[in-house]
């Protein structure tokens, strides 16, 4: 018997797979139904509303209904709170959609948060674009307020205001006691001075008084400016007086920007240059604008605004005599008191009536000088009626 007869030989060329009748009879299973898209899907259909509302508990279909009405993120950001209320009322009336109470507040909160984020990005972008040129341009004015020792007391009081008598000499004499008190408690005051920028008493009119009183309790710093004639460009490391007055114009521009942002956010709008404006200027890259410097020379700027001819004449006279900025600053008080005398001694009304001065607080020292001169004038008038001699200026 041939054993090969019982062997099965597989021919790969002719063999075909046997059809599976069982699988043919059974229909293929239907594909699984598509899952409902999550909240983070379909970003193009809602125009970015889902990203705006996602963190504020607003339902997806609420955002979809808002998108069906034609609203986008940019549209909502440019709408006021009253317009947002009208939009939500229209949503309820047109689609018969019941908005939850939390959704009404969530929509407004999301819009406000997005506005703040855009404003912060804009300030940061502006700081990156303008930071290099700004710091290079104004580094010289900033170095004047560094922690440097005083040259002499005459730098602070400016040679007694150029020989002016009466109250002006008393003010200069009262300032001679300041250096001893500064050296006594310098360490404690330096910490307080560093916290001054973060103080939030923006709307208190006593800021002007606090600034003048702090002259006694702060370490005296070197003046960052030199006396220059109108139109003269300063030479050396210090800037001229035209540049100083230009800083006040910049503060006015920053105040307008702060007011615009506050109105858009529905927040309290400042009417004067406060700490909020100085912080905004710092964020915008204008580190050379700070509260101590601007409050220190605000009466000089007031004279420049109220009587530019007298201010220019005073600058030329002090430039010819070689006087420093401290002497020029002290001499600026007397013309302002004379202006106040011609207008009933009401220096606050004079400031508030001027468009460029109404945003600044009246320095306490200027107000005190006006009060003292007013009292002296009243005493002199009384003495002339009774036949007495001339009255002396009253100290204060």
Curated annotation (Swiss-Prot):
InterPro entries: FLO/LFY_C (IPR035209), FLO_LFY (IPR002910), Floricaula/leafy_C_sf (IPR038276), LFY_SAM (IPR035079). Residues 178-190 have a biased composition (Basic residues). GO terms for cellular component: nucleus. The record marks 268, 275, 279, 326 as: Interaction with DNA. Residues 221-225, 290-297, 361-364 bind DNA. Coiled coil: none annotated. Bract, sepal, petal, and carpel primordia, but not in stamen primordia. GO terms for molecular function: DNA binding. Keywords: Activator, Developmental protein, Differentiation, DNA-binding, Flowering, Nucleus, Transcription, Transcription regulation. The keyword Nucleus applies. Its main location: nucleus. GO terms for biological process: cell differentiation; flower development; regulation of DNA-templated transcription. Residues 195-215 have a biased composition (Acidic residues). It is found in: Nucleus. Residues 144-223 are annotated as: Disordered. Required for flower development. FLO may interact in a sequential manner with other homeotic genes affecting floral organ identity. Belongs to the FLO/LFY family. This is Floricaula protein.
């Amino acid at each position: 018997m041939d054993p090969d007869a019982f062997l099965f030989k597989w021919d790969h060329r002719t063999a075909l797979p046997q059809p599976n009748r069982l699988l043919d009879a059974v229909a293929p299973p239907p594909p699984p139904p598509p899952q409902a898209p999550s909240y983070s899907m379909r970003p193009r259909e809602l125009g970015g509303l889902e990203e705006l509302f996602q963190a504020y508990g607003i339902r997806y279909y609420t955002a979809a209904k808002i998108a069906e009405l034609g609203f986008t993120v940019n549209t909502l950001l440019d709408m006021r709170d009253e317009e947002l209320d009208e939009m939500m009322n229209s949503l309820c009336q047109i689609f018969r959609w019941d908005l939850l109470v939390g959704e009404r507040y969530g929509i407004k909160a999301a819009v406000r948060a997005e506005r703040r984020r855009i404003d912060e990005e804009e300030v940061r972008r502006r700081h990156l674009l303008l930071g290099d040129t700004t710091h290079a341009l104004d580094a010289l004015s900033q170095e004047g307020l560094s922690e440097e020792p005083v040259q002499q007391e005459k730098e602070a009081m400016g040679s007694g205001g150029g020989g002016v008598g009466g109250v002006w000499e008393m003010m200069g004499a009262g300032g001679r006691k300041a250096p001893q008190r500064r050296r006594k408690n310098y360490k404690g005051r330096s910490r307080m001075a560093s916290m001054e920028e973060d103080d939030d008493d923006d709307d208190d009119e006593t800021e002007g008084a606090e600034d003048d009183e702090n002259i006694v309790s702060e370490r005296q710093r070197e003046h960052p400016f030199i006396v220059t004639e109108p139109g003269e460009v300063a030479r050396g490391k210090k800037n001229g007086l035209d540049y100083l007055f230009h800083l006040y114009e910049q503060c006015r521009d920053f105040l307008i920007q702060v007011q615009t942002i506050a109105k858009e956010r529905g927040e309290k709008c400042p009417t004067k240059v406060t700490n909020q404006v100085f912080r905004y200027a710092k964020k915008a890259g204008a580190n050379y604008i700070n509260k101590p410097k601007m409050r220190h020379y605000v009466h000089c700027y007031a004279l420049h605004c109220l009587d530019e001819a007298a201010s220019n004449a005073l600058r030329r006279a002090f430039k010819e005599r070689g006087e420093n900025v401290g002497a020029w600053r002290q001499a600026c008080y007397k013309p302002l008191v004379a202006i106040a005398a011609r207008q009933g001694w009401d220096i606050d009304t004079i400031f508030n009536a001027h468009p460029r001065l109404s945003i600044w607080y009246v320095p306490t020292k200027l107000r005190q000088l006006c009060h003292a001169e007013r009292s002296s004038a009243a005493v002199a008038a009384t003495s002339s009626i009774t036949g007495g001699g001339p009255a002396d200026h009253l100290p204060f």
